[in-house]
Amino acid sequence: MGGMTQEWDAGRLDSDLEGVGFDTLAVRAGQHRTPEGEHGDPMFFTSSYVFRTAADAAARFAGEVPGNVYSRYTNPTVRSFEERIAALEGAEQAVATATGMAATLAVVMSLCSAGDHVLVSRSVFGSTISLFDKYFKRFGIEVDYVPLAELSGWDAAIKPNTKMLFVESPSNPLAELVDIAALAEIAHAKGTMLIVDNCFCTPALQQPLLLGADIVVHSATKFIDGQGRCMGGVVAGRSEQMKEVVGFLRTAGPTLSPFNAWIFLKGLETLNLRMRAHCANAQALAQWLEQQDGIEKVHYAGLKSHPQHELAQRQQKGFGAVVSFEVKGGKDGAWRFIDATRLISITANLGDSKTTITHPSTTSHGRLAPQEREAAGIRDSLIRVAVGLEDVTDLQADLARGLAAL
C-alpha cells in the first residue's frame, strides 16, 4: 500500500561487495538502504539525532554502542562517502573533511606534536607550503623541504624526530613524480610515515596505500566531484592512524556537509570513466603543445620526453589531466596567452569537466616569496591547463589563439 514502509532485507545490502571491481565499488560501495528501500543514495540533513532514552544517549556518547550522536561527529550520507573512498583506495578507514586543505591540516595536527619533524616535497601546492611554513612551524613543528624525485635526498634528510614525509605525486602543477613504493620503504626503515596527496590521480589512476604509503589525502573538490560544484576533502589510511585523525576532526570541526558528500557520491560513480576521458584529452594536448613554436617546455608525464615517463607508466594507470607548459615572454607572454583564450575558463580550480587555465606564479603560488617559487620550480612563464571533457580539437583551437598572442 502507498506510503507504507517495510524492513529492508539485510542480505540484499549493496555493502556485500567483496572481490568486485573498481567500477562496481565506485557505484555501490558504502550504500546503506533505509527501511524505505530507496535505490539512490539518501541525503540526511540533520544536525543532531534523537535517542530512545537518556541511557541510550549516554551509551552512544561514551562509545559503548554504535549510532549517530551529532553531525559534527558522524552523518549517514558522509559515512557512505567515507566508506566508498576507503573501498576505492584500499584503506581500512576514511574520514571526510570540509576542504582538501582541512584534510592536510587534520593529518599533521593529529599525528604531530611540538618538536616533531616533517619532510615535505618542494613541489607542492602553494597553500600547502603556506600551511607548513606559516602555521605548523608556529606550533613547534620542524619543517624541511626535499626535491620530490631524489630518493637519496629523502633518506639523508630524515632525522630521529621525523614523524612523517608528505608528498604530492604527481605534483601541482609540474607533474613531478616520486617512486612511492621506494619512498615508503625508506620511510618505514627509519620508523616514520609516508603521506601522499593523491588529488591529481584519484584512486582511479593510482592507489598509494597499495604501494606502501600510510595515509592518503584528497581535495575532493577536484576530480572526485568532477564538475566544480562544491568543496571537500578526505583522509584515508589504516585504522590505527585514522583514530587520531577522526578525534581531531570531531573536536576541531572542519567536517563535510551531507549535501557535499552526496554530490561526491554521485561524482564517484563516473570517476573512472571521466578520468579516462580527461587523460586522453590531456595526452593529445600535451603532444600537440610540444610541437608548437612559442612553447619552451611541456610538463606532462605522458610524454616520452618527461624524465619520469617510465615511472608514471609503472606506478599509475593513466597520466592525469593536468598539463603545464612554459611559454616565451615570461609573465607578459603567459598573461597574453591566457587572455587570448575564449573557450577555456580562467580559474584556479581543476578537476572540472570544463577545461581551466591559470598562471600559477600569480595565483595558486602567488603568496609565496620569489625564492620559494623558484625552489618549487614555479616560473613566471608557466601556465597550467587542467584539461576537461570538451572536444579536443576545440581545445587545440583555443590554445592556438594563445600561441598567436605571443
Segments (PLM) and residue ranges:
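Conserved PLP-enzyme active-site core in the AAT-like
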Residues: 2-19, 26-35, 93-294, 299
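N-terminal "arm"/small-domain region of PLP-dependent enzymes with the aminotransferase-like
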Residues: 2-75, 83
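Acidic-histidine catalytic/liganding microenvironments
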Residues: 88, 289-293, 341
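Conserved C-terminal alpha-helix-loop-beta "cap" of PLP-dependent enzymes
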Residues: 297-383, 387
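Short, acidic Gly/Pro/Ser/Thr-rich loop/turn segments
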Residues: 34, 50-54, 242-243, 330-333, ...
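Glycine-rich beta-alpha junction loops
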Residues: 31, 45-51, 200, 222, ...
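PLP-dependent enzyme catalytic core of the Aspartate aminotransferase-like
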Residues: 1-11, 133-134, 142-144, 160-163, ...
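Conserved N-terminal alpha-helix of the aminotransferase class I/II PLP-enzyme fold
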Residues: 53-102, 127-134
